[in-house]
Regions:
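Generic hydrophobic alpha-helical scaffold/packing signal
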Residues: 28, 32-35, 39, 61-62, ...
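Amphipathic repeat-derived elements
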Residues: 1, 60-68, 141-149
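A signal for specific C-terminal beta-sheet/loop modules enriched in small/flexible residues
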Residues: 13-15, 53, 60, 106
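General structural feature for long, well-ordered alpha-helical segments within catalytic domains
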Residues: 30, 69-72, 175
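C-terminal subdomain of alpha/beta-hydrolase-fold enzymes, centered on the catalytic histidine
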Residues: 15, 19-26, 82-249
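Cap/lid segment of the alpha/beta-hydrolase catalytic domain
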Residues: 1-41, 46-48
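Primarily recognizes the serine-hydrolase "nucleophile elbow" in alpha/beta-hydrolase
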Residues: 37, 43-100
């Protein structure tokens, strides 16, 4: 569908990553169109009725995002007025902070660091930071400061619950810390980890919050590097099937 090609060429020439950025912007439009359509004409179709009961509940629409969906949740919730509550699994903010710390980056680094692209680690780090401006239109960091009051009727207020897994090798826990501080949401008192600078609140809570689960998975590197691939699906994926986390969501 063009995404892989856009990223491949972008690793050799970051100007091409604009195409990937545009696809992220299009995804918000696609979600808006989907929600509007399902709430509207689709919900009235005979196929969505059973025993004269409409099977589509259009009164309460919420968002649940996992991984990239967790990263992009704040932009969706802020820009689409039909949804104002979301659960964001293993997400965070600042894609340029996440990239080099992610095992997902491993598959791209071989080309990015090749003689066809940028052999210098320093050059690659600088370019990733510069690329952030291309991602800002759908970046959580752009929308999290307006979580409570919105902005001028263009950005809408919303509530979120971040569910984070310690030692996540795909989406670094550091980016969840950053997202929570940017938004000013509290951390639940029974969370296994309390990020610096956050208010601590007791559950149940009315409004937004963040909670961290610790499955005692292997520690990821503390530096600006990704962990080994055998860590790839541990903390990131297994929290999704952990009953207390699912119940909380």
């Amino acid at each position: 569908d063009g995404d892989f090609g856009a990223i491949t060429f972008g690793l050799m020439n970051p100007n091409y990553l604009q195409h990937q950025s545009e696809r992220l912007q299009q995804s918000i439009i696609n979600h808006l169109a989907m929600i509007t359509t399902i709430k509207g004409v689709c919900s009235d179709l005979p196929e969505f009725y059973h025993n004269a009961i409409n099977l589509v509940d259009t009164t309460d629409i919420n968002y649940m995002g996992v991984s990239l969906g967790g990263n992009r949740g704040p932009s969706m919730l802020s820009l689409i007025p039909a949804i104002d509550r979301g659960v964001l699994w293993v997400g965070g903010s600042s894609f340029s902070l996440q990239v080099e710390r992610s095992t997902q980056y491993t598959q791209f680094e071989e080309l990015f660091a090749s003689p066809l692209a940028y052999e210098s680690t320093l050059d690659r780090s600088i370019l990733i930071s510069l690329m952030q401006s291309m991602w800002d239109t759908t970046e959580a960091e752009t929308y999290l400061p307006f979580i409570d009051g919105g902005m001028d009727g263009e950005l809408h207020p919303y509530e979120i619950l971040y569910i984070i897994s310690m030692n996540d090798a795909q989406v670094t826990t550091l980016s969840a810390d950053r997202a929570s501080r940017t938004s000013g949401i509290p951390v639940l008192s029974n969370s296994t980890y309390h990020p610096y600078g956050l208010d601590v609140t007791e559950a149940p809570v009315s409004g937004s919050a963040i909670v961290y689960f610790d499955g005692e998975f292997p520690a990821v590197p503390s530096g600006n590097i990704q962990g080994p691939m055998e860590y790839h699906s541990l903390a990131h994926n297994q929290v999704l099937g952990y009953d207390p986390a699912v119940d909380l969501a």
